Each structure stands twice: as C-alpha cells, then as structure tokens.
C-alpha cells in the first residue's frame, strides 16, 4: 500500500520523487553540505488561521491535497545527523548533530510553486543559531531509540524525542511501531525560509521511507503515540484542537544541500 503514495512525501514529509538523471537544474548550484541522517516526521492539522501567521507574504499555507499526509498543515521534523560533511568531504560543524525543524507546506501566491517553508526549530549547537533559514534557536535535544527484532522478522521500534527551550518549555514525542520494509526513493526540492521569503536551498536526497501511520490512507502500524507541546510560541497551534494526520520514519536519509 505504501508504494501507491511514492510521489507524496519525501523532503520534510511533502516532497516529490524524481529521477536525478532526468532532472537538469536551470540554475547554477554550489554544494554546501552533505549529511547522513535518520528522521521522524509527525504531520498534523492545526488551526489554519494560527499557522498562516507563521508564513510570510507571498506564501500561504498549502496542505497536500492528497496522499498519506492529506490536509496536514504543520510538520515536526526530528533529525538525527549521524554524519555532516563539508563540500570537501571533511566533518562539518563537529560532524554530527540533532535538531528539530518546524515546517509548513506552502504555496507561492504569485507563481503557484508549492514547497516547504521552515518557520522555526531548535538546535543544541550555538553555531547553528539562527541557522541558514534564520529561524532556529538554541535548546537541548535528547533522543532515546530502541529496536528489537529476531532473525529475518521485522522488528519493533520505540523512538522518543525531548526538546527543551531556555524558558522551560518542551516538545516530547514517543512513537512505538512495528517496522516494515522501507521504500527506497530519490527526491529533489527547494525549501524556503519564513524569515527571508525568497531564500531557498536545494536538496537532493536518497531515502528509505517507512510510513508508520496515515489517517487518510487508513495505515496504522503505531502501537503507542504520545505528543506533548508546552512551548509558549506554539500555544496557538497546540490548543487541544490539533489532529494527527500521519507519521513517517526515515531509517536512512542521505542528502546533498546546494545554494543556487
């Protein structure tokens, strides 16, 4: 069933799968970084008016019209970077990192382009503040993950993330799920900044994608899901009316990052 949705949800949960060999960029590019990561993406539906305030003109909120994250208008993207390399292949910024990104699926009102807009995030490394998108702040990030399996059978994973800001606010998420064969695919996409609406970076990725839960698609291999958000800047989004749309795990996420 997962393969029916191959073109819906790769980069930040809403990318478009493409074949790199058939994609010829129309702009000059400069490689700035390469990474090896694992990720967890939680797609949610929150109040449209509240989330629109996070997105600058000329962007507006543009939830996916179909697929496993249909109508999701806010994404938590939890990223565990196992290796970070500069353009010469040397360890960059310490060589590893963990952080969380807040992403809103956007639609450009003038061009019609649809792309993720990064509206915020947390990083433990002050060197990454405010980050390339000028929206990241410093916080502490903890991840606890266990995987249990035997022989050739699919295993069971327990993934817990805790993010704390300097004022005592937190984001906590736990997902326990039955693993399945992941979908391997490639994607390319531009991702924009809420702080500088015209700024973008170009991402080329190769991923192994495990769709854990999709309410629109009727898929559910999640045995336990908990999300708790107490950060003041997110209180208008998480007022008790938010709804889960889907959860995606990326046991492997390889990417190259370019500037135009």
Feature-to-residue mapping (PLM):
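N-terminal domain-onset segments
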Residues: 27-82, 212-244, 250, 257-260
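Generic structural hydrophobic/aromatic packing signal, biased to beta-strands
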Residues: 14, 42, 76-79, 102-104, ...
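Interaction-surface and assembly-scaffold signal
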Residues: 136-260
